[in-house]
Each structure stands twice: as C-alpha cells, then as structure tokens.
C-alpha cells in the first residue's frame, strides 16, 4: 500500500509485527453507534499486530541530494502499544515529491515546487469496546507546511466569436513566484458515558499566510499570428515589429503584480447520539462553529497599447481587503423503526453565516494630479498630506465596495431507509427555506442599498444498492439540487478596474437546477484474483449560470456579464477489469476504459468599435452622478446592442489503459499501453473543430538480487497528435532508472541513485476547451535530474521469549504501511482499491 502525497507522513510497517491483515468496508461512526446502516462506508485495511511485539518504535530517515540543487528529505518515527500510538513526521524537498517508480506521462505538476511539512499525530483509547460504558478515546494532530512555486507559463488561445467572423487569438507569457504557509491542528474526544450515549467533540484551528508576485506580457490578434514566421509575442514587443503583424494586432499589455494575504480561524464541532433502544430508535444533536478573520492586499501596474488609434492605458493600482466571517449551525435528528428493516428519519438544521468584506481600491497613477490649491479650504502652512489623505484622494470609489452578508438557512430532511443483507434503499427530500440579507455600498456608482432575498429549495435524493454477494454489488444514486446566483451577481454594478475585462452584474438571474445520476457495479473474485468495476454518470443543469462575453473587435476589450442558459449536460462511462493467470497467478492483466461526452453551451457576441470605456469617459464627466448614470446605461447598451449567439461545443473523449504484469521472487516486469482520443465540434467556428490523440506505450522492470541490490527502470514513448500548433504535436521518450544497495546485517541502511527523464524529453502541455474558447498552455516543471538517497530504517522491538519472531530487538525487514501513518483503525488514503474489497481475515490481537 503506497501513499506518495507530500502532505502526509510516510512510515513503514515491519513484517515481523504483522499478525493478520483485514480489508473490508468499514461502517460509519453513525452506523456503529446507532445500528442504522447509513451507507457511508470507507474501504479500510486493518493491520493486526502481534501483541508480544507491541511497545515498539519505528524510525525511518531518508536523505536525498541531486544535481541542479535538488534535495529530498523525509523523517518518520512512531511508537505504538495496545491502546496508543504517537507519530512524528516531516519532509523537505524541491522535487515536487514525485516518488519513484512507474512511467510518468502527461499531466505533471505545474512549476518548480519546494515544500516543507512537519507534523505530530497521536491517538489513545482506554481499552474499552465501542458502546461500552466509560469508553474514552483521545486523538489529535498538528501540522505545519510551507510551499513555494516558481511558475513560467506560455499560453495561446482562441476566443470563439459570432458566425461569419473569424476568432480572436491571444498569446501570453507569465512568470510568477508564490509562497504559502499553513498551520492547522485538531483535537478529538470520543466518550461513551453509558452504553446508550455517544459524544464526539473536535476543536480545530488554522493559520495561513501567502505571498505572490508576477509579471506578464500578452497580445490580442484579429487572426492567427502563427500564420506568420517567428514568435508572435516576441515580435509584437520588439522595437520595430513587422508591419504584417501589427496589421492584425488589436492590443498588447504588460503587467506587474504582487500581493499577500493572512487568515486565522478557530472552530469546533460536537456530536451527541442517544440510542433509545436496540432496534434503531435514537435522537442526535450536532453543533458546529467557525470564526475566521484575515486580510489581503494587492499591487498591480498595467500598460496597455492599442492598435486602432485609441490612447494607451496606464494604471498603477493598490487594493486592501479586510474580511471577517463566522458561522454556526445546530442540527437535531430523530430516527424511528416502523417495520422490519425499515427506518424513518427526520432532521432539522438551522445555520447562520455572517461575512463582512471591505474592498478599497486606489489608483496610484493619479497622485501626480493632487493639488492643495483650493483657495477656500487649503491646509495650514507647513502641513503635508498624511498617507491616509493621499490614499483617500486617489481612492477609486467606482470600483471600491463594502459588503456585509447575513445568511439564515433552515433545512428539514425527511427520509426512509430499508436495509437487509441484500438490499439497501434510502430515499428522502430536503426542504430548505433560506433568507439572505446584503448591505452593499459602492460610492462611485451611487449604490447604497440593502437587499433581502428569500428562496425555498427542494432537493430530492435516492440511493439503492443490491448486494449479490460479499464481493459483488450494484448501486444506483440520484440527487436533484438547486443553486442560487450570488447576491453581488444580482446587483446592477460595473467593475472596470481591468481595462481589458469589464464585468457587470445581472439582476435578472434565475436559480439553477442540477440533476445528477450515478450507476455503479463492482465485483471481486478472490479465488481467481479477478476484480471489475463499471460505472455510468450523467449530469444536467437547467438555467445554468454562464458568462456572456461581448468582444470589441477594435480594442480587444471584453465585456462580461452572467446570464442563464440551457443545454449544458454531460455523461460518462468507465470500466475496469483485472485478473491474475498462469501458475500461482504470477501474471496479471488490467484494463481501464473510459468514455465521456460534454455538451457545453455559451453566449458569444461581438461589436465593432464600442468606443471609449469608462476610464476615458471619466476624464470629461465631472459629476459622479452623471458618470454613474452614464456608465450603467452605457454598458447595458453594449449588451443589448450586441447580437448574442448560442455557441454549442460538443466534446467526445475516449480512452483505454492496458497493463500486463509479471511477478517472480526476484524479478517483476510490466508492459503498458495508453490511448486517449478527443473529438470536438464547434457550432460557430467550424475551423476550430479538432481531433486530438494522446498515446503512449512502454515497459518497466525491477530486479532484486539476494545480496541486497535492486535495479528498477521504466521507459515510455508518449506522443500527441492533432493540435493546431505544430510544436504541441510531440514525441517524448521518457526513461527513468534507479539502482540501490542495502548494507548492514539486517539491511537497515540503503544507498540508492535515482535518475529521472534521462533523455530530457519531458514537456508540460495542457488544453482547455469549452463553448467560448480553446486554450493551449505550456509551463515549466521539475523534469530531468538525478538524486542520491541515503535511507536508514530502525525498528526497536521489546524483548520477548514467547515469540520466535522477536529474536532480535532490531530488524530491517520492512514494507510500506497503509496511508503512511499507522494508527487505530488506520485507513489508507484514496478510494476503493481497484480489485474490490478483498477477503476479510480474523480479528486482531492488537490493531493499529
């Protein structure tokens, strides 16, 4: 069982400690306490340890150094007994913590990433069983993490315009640096004061701090600039760009930005369940509270040049946004058995959320125009303006706002549940009356209002599962839900702080309704070691909230407003099958097939020469009232005068992944093949119809010599075809290798050398495609490098004459543990194992 997540501690479970393994679907805490199966299960792997080998210490240290100043260090230490476990873990690396093994294909992480993570995790119980009077369990964790990212990104995109016109094309290059620090902690107390009552209390806290800076260049063109020679972006920013390029150029922009944010929060939850008998009757209570407070600040400088004769736009902006949020909720539930295997439930929940946000934006480029020349109200001689006075003088009231939200939510859930060994069925409906109150101020647009919205949502849901056997089941799920547009989207306000993207609200927005359907079948045959999984899902949205874009041909300015639209739906099917064959099942074959179809719609509009934007109007509109009135009408006229066409983008995706593995005592090998095909059709811009392919094939092998040496290698050819930019149609031969040697009597010390992307052909390309645009991107990443690792593993067992296995206090024989952190009832991260829930084995003598 492996977990390569850099956010988790990585530890090892030693073979000598393991008595039995048990893989099964663990019931939820609610089911264990009430006896009512709520269907919320998690596949877990319990490791049963030998009691005589408890009170043990496991300590692992992994130090790694590489070329290009790469490093990777990990540390893990844990001590456990029959009733307790405490773990310390940490890691530092600037490799993205990729781990090793298995060919690496498309979809690598973005940017050059460095991270640090340290944590403490503990659990203790008093040895009493669940539901036993006086049972007490304590636990908790504290974690610190820091991540830094250096990202270089290049993007070329095509914005679909109306029929009969060409698309708009954009190119951008950006470099950004970001860092974030996160500290969080949680305590857990589970107590059963008597056999009928269960109490769970969990306080939490967190702190986050982030910083970022970026610089970028971008340009917009009337037609595809790749039809000309050279790099479009480099050429348009040259001292003397070619006339052929400037003739199709619309604008070019340079931008610098930096920002920071801080947030602190505390919270907690409490659950109380009281059983009123052994037949499933119970009452429950849940309380939850959270408070957070923070602020963010941003600085930005933008310089925009237009190619239609319009004056250049230069902005130097600063914004400051303090924010405070708190919320609480109270939930009461009652469950009543009314027939054999039938149970009725009713729940009521009240929740309140308060959010206060004050965004102030300042145009620092206007400082030069400040004068103290008012003869009627000049300040005393010798007085200088304060920082607050200077900022107030250049405050952008038009784009500054103050908003206070108050959310009052009520929820009543009525449901019935039927459950036996074969069939589980539950259905219910939720009634959600909600009231939202928004106090909103926007001085520059003469808006000072309080808006109250009342809605009543109804959400039905149904779940059905049929258990053919312990390892074969069918499941059907349906859910319908409503979502409301945000309150600010319903206000008739304008934000033109970005001269190239002007956004508006829309008071006419309607709620959306989403239907979600899922069908699944999973099965596993332990004797044949064969597992299968098949699934189908469908999602459809009515009155979806889409973003309508009106594009100005002359300037490249985009006007954006949310609008309702119908016709968005998607469906997908996927299946997996794997099985073992040959003598002792040393061969395994696995196949994963997926299919999806997305029907995406969006509004596209264009206008020719809208004229001046609000920032130029402001130069000659002296009255704030006149300016606000003019711009509301002006921008609304942009949308009403532009013909909105519905663009339909249909995308069909199909994929197949095949893997053949062979495993022997000292050698194992695998052969892989992957094929992904995407077929997209655009109703307006048929020239943007694409058929793209991604395919790869390769092999991997591991050799383990009896003297402690091992060799691992993998190689794969990855290819792309069908992209509009020829540089994206690539062939990449990726080869990784590792050589390691273990030392000392028990092989506790290991020296390994790992080499990634030996042939230096890895690239990082991605695509986004919807009804409004097509965007292809490249970014930098950690690709080709080597690492030298020194790994030491120490296991200290207590002395015991009753076990032949405990003949030494130190042992280097090990294997990786589940989820990286052994603990009471420890669960591996992620979802169900691909082969289904394997066979259950005997109860533990001691479990961690």
Regions found by a protein language model. Give the residues of each.
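Short, small-residue-biased leader/transition segments that mark boundaries at the very start
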Residues: 1-14
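Phosphoinositide-dependent membrane-docking surfaces
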Residues: 17-24
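Primarily recognizes Gram-negative and organellar outer-membrane beta-barrels
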Residues: 8, 25-69, 84-848
